[in-house]
Amino acid sequence: MLELDAAGHLAYKRLLSPQMISPVSPARARWIAITSCMLMAIRASAAPEQTANAITEIRSVLQAQQDAWNRGDIDGFMNGYARSASTVFISEDTVRRGWETVRDRYREKYSNRSKMGTLAFSDLEITLLSSDSAVASGSWKLNRANDQPHGQFTLILKRLPEGWRIVHDHTSAAPPTP
């Protein structure tokens, strides 16, 4: 701890003196060491399984979005997004905020099945940032009668009570091929 000494200089003050620390018996020290190792081993073995489960759950959300899109179900597609005013969607040099705003944009831009085409996600990479947040990136492509728009996306997902949901979507389209 730092405090001013009698001369007004900043000085380090010891919080504990050696007399304040009580000795630990060898048996208790072994028990503490063994228990600590067991807890770390349990945590280490659970982490890969939790990571795999989270990645599988996120892949399922994106697959459900793709399936809903390919049925012409924009509302079903939107189930992958957090129903929140803070949900963000960035594309076409525009930032849209709020679940309803994002849904309305999809409904306007893809007002019929021919405009929707068939959606395919590929090159999916998912990285957990914590136990309740992840980033996913990949490619998207729409197969339509007259064109095949495609591009890249980066998503930030959060684990909410209803499951993993997209809270931030940055999608870009490649220039059309001549």
Where are these regions (language model features)?
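Bacterial N-terminal signal peptides that target proteins for export
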Residues: P18-I32
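A solvent-exposed, acidic/Ser-Thr-rich amphipathic alpha-helical stretch
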Residues: I55, I74-L129, K141, D147-Q148
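A short, structured loop/turn motif at beta-sheet edges
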Residues: I126-D132, K158-G163
